[in-house]
């Protein structure tokens, strides 16, 4: 469907809207830290907005609207990949809630930031490859590399947060 000229504008708009939202999130975080405007509400709402943006993007791209005539996904995504991404977000959000409820801030770490950046590149890249870019082999290979890199970094990020939370979880489970 994406090759039809009447749909190309949708691909352009969707990818640019996602990029503007992702860059806006980065700029807002930078300004909040730079001007010492970090609040408890912001520590909750910013990760929530990140989840909506990223998980929403991946879930939508997994939808049946992005299947070919045989019912195969044209996005390069598989259901298990999106489950890994969404599952990681739910797990880390739960750990963040647990930590914040205990009075301990739960800031993003290096792997969490790398994950957000790569996911924020992967979603619009996938969107752009729904149009004429499908005919350019290196763009499709780059899409697949980005998808697999996203999955790898998502898992590494989950493991890093679990490792950092291990002591607090063990302490809480004992008493």
PLM features per residue range, with description:
Residues 1-175:
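Alpha-helical transmembrane bundles and membrane-interface segments of multipass inner-membrane proteins
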